[in-house]
Amino acid sequence: MYKLVLIRHGESQWNLENRFTGWHDVDLTDTGREQARNGGRMLKEAGFEFDLAYSSVLTRAIRTLNLVLEEMGQMWLPVERHWRLNERHYGALTGLDKAETAAKHGDEQVKIWRRSFDVPPPDVDESSEHFPAHDPRYRGIDKNVLPKAESLKLTIDRVLPYWHDVIRPSILGGKRVIIAAHGNSLRALVKYLDDMSDAEILDLNIPTGVPLVYDLDADLRPIKREYLGDPEAIKAMMDAVAKQGQAK
């Protein structure tokens, strides 16, 4: 049996401001840092140790992973970062206030942009600061490969090759793995691992800073999946995520 731990980054500044973040690089709030540290403490208390860690190339995921490993006394752990684990790209919505966008376009339209499976938001313009080709961390990557906007389906199409080519072989090779990433890139992995339908994944909300632990069989099929922590507190965090795109 194999174990895999997923953790969504702690609260970021744009989470706090209820803005569409996507690939924009923002750091954690003080609350987010404490969420990450608490996640690390829970993992340590539960006896977890890791051999290898993965994260996106965005600061909020990198910072979360660093704080988790610091609390666990595993700062030395090898870490592989890759853009394929980035958050979903929110296109032209990047930086906009979610509630104000809902008030302007309607709750239903914003829900479709945020939570439908295969409808992306409007593309970001190539002249925008939010087009990834302008960011030095994506230097050397064909700009036609970089997204201008993504649905969850497109996010899954981006994430899964990295899972199959890199992460899965590491786990099957005996590595104990933790992945620090984002709400939608982790939803992509959860949908695949749990064989969830397109409809089922729409109702899945992943809380910030809470370790999600998988027990996997020899073929990496889930035997058990559970969050570490208080169930009522975790449910409240999930509910808060679900309400982010609603007009005030």
UniProtKB/Swiss-Prot annotation:
> Which chemical reaction does it catalyze?
(2R)-2-phosphoglycerate = (2R)-3-phosphoglycerate
Q: Where does this protein act, in terms of pathway? A: Carbohydrate degradation; glycolysis; pyruvate from D-glyceraldehyde 3-phosphate: step 3/5
**In its keyword annotation, does this UniProt entry include Protease?**
no
Annotated site, Transition state stabilizer, chain positions: H182
The Swiss-Prot or TrEMBL record annotates one GO molecular function as: phosphoglycerate mutase activity
Please list the residues that make up the active site: H9 (tele-phosphohistidine intermediate), E87 (proton donor/acceptor)
Q: What class of enzyme is it?
A: isomerase
Gene3D superfamilies according to UniProt: Phosphoglycerate mutase-like
Do you know which SUPFAM superfamilies this protein is assigned to? Phosphoglycerate mutase-like (SSF53254)
| Residues at which substrate binds | 8-15, 21-22, 60, 87-90, 98, 114-115, 183-184
Q: Name one Pfam family in it.
A: His_Phos_1
| E.C. designation(s) | 5.4.2.11
Q: What does this protein do?
A: Catalyzes the interconversion of 2-phosphoglycerate and 3-phosphoglycerate.
Which family does the entry's similarity section mention? Belongs to the phosphoglycerate mutase family. BPG-dependent PGAM subfamily.
Q: Cite the record's note on assembly.
A: Homodimer.
Q: What is this protein called?
A: 2,3-bisphosphoglycerate-dependent phosphoglycerate mutase
Lineage of the source organism? Answer: Bacteria, Pseudomonadati, Pseudomonadota, Gammaproteobacteria, Cellvibrionales
Q: Which gene encodes it?
A: gpmA
